[in-house]
Amino acid sequence: MNWQEHIISDPKILIGKPTIKGTRISVELILDLFSSGWSEKQILDSYPSITSDSVRAVFAYLKDCIQQEFYFPISA
């Protein structure tokens, strides 16, 4: 999955937070919805401007961030 086709960061949109291309829906919002127990179907039904590929791109983006060691350390 090439997340760059779906995720952008534009300083004019949500102060540059990563968003789904063509929307003001942030990567952070999608992750928050999933962590709150929402299913992909619920997200797609609630936000019809995004696609399943866009949702998968959020996770591909997150994976690349983690691989680049772009994360917060967690103490044991």
Where are these regions (language model features)?
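Short, Lys/Arg-enriched N-terminal segment that forms or immediately precedes the first helix
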Residues: Q4-T19
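Long, charge-rich, low-complexity alpha-helical segments
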Residues: I25-A76
